[in-house]
A protein has these predicted regions:
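Hydrophobic alpha-helical transmembrane segments of polytopic
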Residues: 7-14, 46, 121, 159, ...
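Membrane-embedded alpha-helical segments of multi-pass transporters/permeases
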Residues: 19, 23, 87, 91, ...
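Alpha-helical transmembrane segments of polytopic integral membrane proteins
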Residues: 29, 58-61, 90, 94, ...
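Flexible loop linkers connecting adjacent transmembrane helices
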Residues: 24-42, 63-81, 88-117, 263-277
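Membrane-interface "cap" regions at the ends of multi-pass membrane proteins
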Residues: 1-61, 167-170, 189, 193
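Helix-loop-helix module between adjacent transmembrane segments
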Residues: 18, 52-53, 73-170, 225-233, ...
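Loop-to-helix junctions at membrane interfaces in multi-pass transport proteins
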Residues: 2-3, 40, 63-77, 184-355
């Protein structure tokens, strides 16, 4: 894929605009509380967007639709325990954190136990968050590497450097505002992609037909019990029980002890605002995740009629074609093209049968 002038303009304006807006909005962060907690003046809706923006990244844009494309909608069950966890946190953790005027979740452990406990948990958080952030930075870097052919190492440094600029200079408020913008940009882009996928379907094939094709292919399996003829399948990762139980405890730990989330709702004006932001997060996250996964199902329907690339990373594909594996790769690509043609025939026949 070659970037046109319009693509470059959108990319540069988005990157510079997000950074400049975040730094501008952080001008009031003149003290420690302002830097880390935005002076505890955020309204609930802004905290909500910040919480959801923390969860939304290039990983969301790339992996969630891909998950539905390959495995269907059942991944949404993973979030069924989230609303229950938000209720528990709103009743227990939020009042405690606000009453003690904490800066971090780990500060409570120091007051309850000792400084060593706080240091250990803080270290574990920084280690896990460092690994997670590295993956989140790598994802957009991989996209730019694929589309533009940039060196992946320098692309990672470039993307990470931009994050460091507004995070270090602006503090919590800069992060909150930039995450809100990123959240809006990511989800608008995803729904534009879904609209484009439906509009690009063959003539006579619409949104309903795309859902039928995805459904007949087993992609709209929203609720699964894990039950088979031989009993319960313990190897089934995504079902209603793993979603309710596992999702509940995972959300409880993530939103209750992970500073990347705790630090968001501690910026709220008061305890009530924090509670509302968490409860609203539990309310809107499940349907929003449902829509994100639905995009993957629409992409599955789209690629049932049109040829999907055998290898999406064009930069690495050129490396393969220039290597000793070029002949083998061309043979595999030819076989893949034949499968795509057969898949299109079956999708067309199915679409006609559903009329």
């Amino acid at each position: 894929m070659n970037f046109q002038a319009a693509d470059w303009i959108v990319l540069v304006i988005t990157l510079l605009g997000v950074i400049a807006f975040g730094i501008y909005k952080s001008s009031t962060s003149r003290n420690l509380e302002g830097y880390f907690l935005s002076n505890r003046q955020m309204p609930w809706w802004m905290v909500l967007l910040s919480i959801m923006g923390t969860q939304a990244s290039a990983i969301t844009f790339l992996t969630a639709p891909g998950q539905a494309y390959t495995d269907g909608m059942r991944f949404v069950q993973y979030y069924f325990g989230l609303p229950l966890a938000m209720i528990v946190l709103a009743i227990t953790f939020v009042p405690l954190f606000h009453r003690l005027k904490l800066f971090t979740a780990y500060e409570f452990l120091e007051q309850r136990f000792d400084g060593k406990t706080r240091m250990l948990t803080s270290f574990l958080f920084l280690l896990s968050r460092g690994l997670s952030t590295g993956i989140s930075v790598f994802a957009p870097s991989l996209v730019l590497h694929s589309m533009l052919g940039w060196d992946i190492y320098w692309t990672n440094i470039f993307m990470g450097g931009l994050l460091i600029i507004y995070t270090v200079t602006g503090g919590a408020k800069a992060v909150a505002y930039t995450q809100q913008l990123q959240f809006v940009i990511i989800y608008i882009a995803m729904f534009i992609a879904a609209y484009y996928a439906v509009q690009s379907l063959p003539e006579g094939v619409g949104f309903t037909d795309a859902l039928h094709i995805a459904g007949k292919s087993g992609k709209l399996n929203v609720i699964t019990t894990g039950q088979t003829e031989l009993g319960f399948d313990w190897k089934d990762r995504y079902n209603i029980w793993s979603g309710l139980i596992g999702g509940f405890f995972l959300a409880l730990s993530y939103f209750g002890t992970d500073q990347s989330q705790v630090g968001r709702y501690l910026t709220a004006k008061d305890e009530k605002q924090s509670r509302v932001s968490l409860l609203m997060n539990g309310l809107v996250k499940v349907p929003l995740q449902f829509l994100i996964l639905l995009i993957g199902c629409l992409l599955f329907a789209y690629y049932s009629f049109f040829k999907a690339p055998a290898f999406f990373n064009q930069a690495q594909e050129q490396q393969v074609l220039a290597s000793t594996y070029a002949t083998e790769y061309r043979e595999e690509t030819a076989a893949f093209t034949q499968l795509q043609s057969r898949k299109k025939e079956l999708a067309t026949a199915l679409s006609s049968a559903l009329k």
